[in-house]
Amino acid sequence: MACGATLKRSMEFEALMSPQSPKRRRCAPLPGSPATPSPQRCAIRPEMQQGQQQPLSQLGGDRRLTPEQILQNIKQEYTRYQRRRQLEGAFNQCEAGALNEVQASCSSLTAPSSPGSLVKKDQPTFSLRQVGILCERLLKDHEDKIREEYEQILNIKLAEQYESFVKFTHDQIMRRYGARPASYVS
């Protein structure tokens, strides 16, 4: 019965799911991102028609990031990180004002922090160019790993398909000739 129910959909349902539908898909914003979704994140690929397939070399080609795009993404992430640190600092200052009397009583127990440690904390470990190079290398390594996994899966599937073909051929031969011994003439 469930099979029959899925075959008898109304035309209204298909109208809602068609690409020409007046309804648009929404993109859920990622945590920590601005409330308005960026068009880059919401880009929906057009549905491919049946029978059209892209070769493996073209699948990853349109998703490659140029070094300029990687650098721009890193800069955006760095500005978000700086804003987050500023907000955390402002929040900590508000808490510090409320807990001032507790800190005054505990200050005699703890050693004062040296001003040199604060400057060292703010210095970046890598330059922006180095971070870009690291990101490119990580992306390339990840892509290579995915390609290797894909090749392994394809080889396994091919071996399974070949094994089933051999079994099928053997069964066909056994049906046709039965238990008779094979001869070169037949």
Curated annotation (Swiss-Prot):
GO molecular function: transcription coregulator activity
Major localisation: nucleus
GO CC term (a single one): chromatin
Localization per record: Nucleus
Keywords: Nucleus
GO biological process, alphabetically ordered: myoblast migration involved in skeletal muscle regeneration; negative regulation of skeletal muscle satellite cell proliferation; positive regulation of lamellipodium assembly; positive regulation of macrophage chemotaxis; positive regulation of myoblast differentiation; positive regulation of transcription by RNA polymerase II
Residue numbers covered by motif SYVS motif: 183-186
Top-level lineage group: Eukaryota
Annotated segments matching region Disordered: 14-65
Compositionally biased region (Low complexity): 49-60
UniProt-listed InterPro entries: Akirin (IPR024132)
Keyword Electron transport part of the UniProt annotation: no
Family, similarity comment: Belongs to the akirin family.
Functional description taken from the UniProt entry: Molecular adapter that acts as a bridge between proteins, and which is involved skeletal muscle development. Functions as a signal transducer for MSTN during skeletal muscle regeneration and myogenesis.
Protein name listed in UniProt: Akirin-1A
Provenance organism: Xenopus laevis
